[in-house]
Design a protein with these regions (language model features):
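A short, structured N-terminal alpha-helical element that caps or precedes a catalytic domain
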Residues: 1-66, 71-73
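Flexible, charged surface loops at secondary-structure boundaries
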Residues: 1-2, 36-43, 57-61, 93-95, ...
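Core AdoMet radical
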Residues: 8, 46-47, 114-210, 221-231, ...
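Short, charged, surface-exposed secondary-structure boundary motifs
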Residues: 43-45, 57, 73-81, 111, ...
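Ser/Thr/Gly-rich flexible loops in soluble cytosolic domains mediating phosphotransfer, phosphorylation
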Residues: 65-91
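A structural motif corresponding to the C-terminal lobe/cap of the Radical SAM core domain
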Residues: 188, 193, 202-311
């Protein structure tokens, strides 16, 4: 009788890359693999968690391996033999895109980001041939443009006419400082609009310059997506949101949370600001301070979805 493996995606039902790799690897070892059921027992269980504030399971039967950024300091890192296994996309039958990391790490040392501690300085991780099995691709790289290997892989993506989304965002400072990279990105077929980040007002100049270069070389769609990190300085976030509106960019606000703390520790004003930015009917028609100070701010409670994400 074959051994069995249970998989737990603790955060959500969104496709989990690590679990897909684990599934593929253990299937080659003859294991029967399925998503975890509390009514069954398994020879081995893998649990993956992205966010530290997501409640863990109270009880795991049998032998459990825990991994992911949500387990700060205690996460198991996948060994190379699993890390470089093509993901088992059959775990998510409706998934119409491939997923993976071309590079790991980053050249930046942002104090709010766990990547420098978790992955170190930027380095090549995998050729797209290792994990691409669809015509659509979601790359999870943190700073792919900072790597020559990453740029070579983008060329390969272009040549193969793969639609791609770098869903962690592209470094606006690199784009702003190198028109050749803006030209390269203009040749990409985008699965979703190109993403950048403006985590503080000091990054505004780079985002504006990058936007101008990208539009100059006709990188489309031209309404680029911009992550806004929202800390306690709401004035800073408000100024950044205003620039996004001025330059016709599409902002998405994320309330900053120290990863060692609970999501409950974010402030009400952080939440209100994220609601204002992310519920577009408000962002386009009402100033934040009017939204904050009038009954309008109560309207979002009737809308589906929280429209706020801790980062």
């Amino acid at each position: 009788m074959s051994k069995t493996l249970g998989l737990i995606n603790i955060d959500s039902k969104i496709p989990n890359l690590a679990l897909m790799k684990v599934s593929a690897f253990y299937k080659t070892k003859g294991y029967g693999v399925e998503f975890f059921s509390p009514f069954k027992t398994y020879d081995l269980t893998y649990a993956s968690k992205v966010f530290s504030y997501t409640p863990d399971y109270d009880y795991y039967p049998g032998n459990v391996v825990k991994g992911g950024t949500g387990y700060i300091g205690n996460a198991v890192v996948l060994p190379d033999e699993i890390e470089h296994t093509c993901p088992d996309y059959s775990l998510y039958p409706d998934m119409d895109y491939s997923m993976g990391f071309i590079t790991r790490g980053c050249i930046r040392t942002c104090n709010f980001c766990i990547v420098p501690d978790k992955e170190g300085y930027i380095k090549p991780n995998a050729d797209i041939d290792e994990f691409v099995r669809h015509k659509n691709l979601v790359c999870l790289d943190n700073n792919v443009l900072a790597s020559e290997f990453g740029l070579e892989q983008i060329e390969k993506i272009i040549e193969r006419k793969i639609k791609v989304d770098f869903n962690q965002g592209l470094d606006a400072r690199i784009i702003a400082g190198n028109p050749d990279i803006a030209k390269l990105l203009s040749r990409v077929k985008w699965l979703k609009p190109l993403r950048m980040a403006m985590d503080n007002i000091g990054e505004a100049e780079a985002v504006i310059k990058a936007t101008e270069l990208l539009r100059k070389y006709n990188t489309t769609p031209k309404r680029y997506f911009v992550y806004l990190l929202v800390k306690n300085d709401i004035e800073d976030a408000y100024a950044r949101a205003g620039l996004c509106k001025k330059y016709e960019l599409n902002p998405f606000a994320q309330a900053y949370l120290n990863p060692k703390l609970s999501c409950k520790n974010i402030t009400k004003e952080q939440i209100n600001f994220c609601k204002w930015v992310n519920v577009k009917i408000f962002f386009k028609s009402v100033d934040y301070y009017d939204f904050k100070d009038t009954r309008t701010s109560r309207l979002y409670k009737s809308l589906k979805g929280e429209s706020v994400l801790c980062f």
